[in-house]
Amino acid sequence: MPDFLDIALPLLRLPTAPFHEHRIVAAIDTLIDDWSSTHTPLSIERDTAGNLIIRYEGANSGDWLYLTGHLDHPGFGFVEHLTRQDLLFERLGGLPVQFCRDAHVQIHSTRDLHPPLSGRITAYLEDTLFEGERRPAFRVSVDESTTAVGHDSFAVWDLPETDTKKRKLRATACDDLAGVAVGLTVLANLLKEGARSRVALLLTRAEETGFGGMLDYAASDQLDQEGVFINIECSSCLAGAPLGDGPVIRVGDRRWLFDPQVTAALVKAATDPSLAQLPYQRRLMDGGTCEATVLSRAGVRTAAVALPLANYHNTGRRGVRREAINLDDAEHLVELLTRVARTGATNLLHSGDSGQDEWLQ
């Protein structure tokens, strides 16, 4: 079965943006199809919002453990033609607008109706009126006719190719495609081992524009009230979690503290004396809000982990830059989540009970 890099590199080379995750979804469909056979306990489904739920059912009973991540990254959504060579794009998610002037973008089509077009941002329009609302937008100029660009088109930063160097993985959209790759690698490990557990990977859409996919899932009948959830994110290292010091076991975010029992179980799995000790960082990570808060507020047991991230949302010191994670952090996070996934949700909660007792002694 493939390892983390085998899965991450192809995904991270694909464009994505809120509401424009189709290339990532197609790649995951192909991957799961390659792994599946008539005897493989693996299935994939979509909910009404377009979220993916990949299930590994290695046991016939027991509560489900859900790993979650999101399929999008901040980008630009096409609005209208201004002239034959000038286009208006709306802002989709958090973008480093202070560096946008003259920055280059690649324009894609949701249905792949045209090859990527190169464009340049010529203006940031902070208060643009369209569809009855005032929203931030960008004017993008291209060197050729824009007749191929339509309402299914979107744009992403035009940055150097994804690569690895000195144990760092650099890509336009580590957040959260690296987290998605971690979850997929955990499923690959379970398949390889034939683990007797029930684990699902929930991959949501439009997280960067206000948790659209997760809010829809949390409000739907598909929300598993008996399940245990662990959110996988990439979170800025500026919150006090350096790259290379291990993945973060996240006790909370800006708005919420997560389930202490599940958090304790994660710590116990990392420090299990019968296995190799895994480096980890236990942090609040209050620089922003993540999908674990949505799930917690919906009433389900939720914890969170994160990969420390450099150049969060492509914000470098002097311009738009690729994001970066540490490969050791990613591989240790895969191992940590594989350990808890092997045990399943019920055993995870029992482990968390004893882990909390140890903290109080």
Located regions from the model:
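N-terminal hydrophobic/helix-forming segments and targeting peptides
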Residues: 1-361
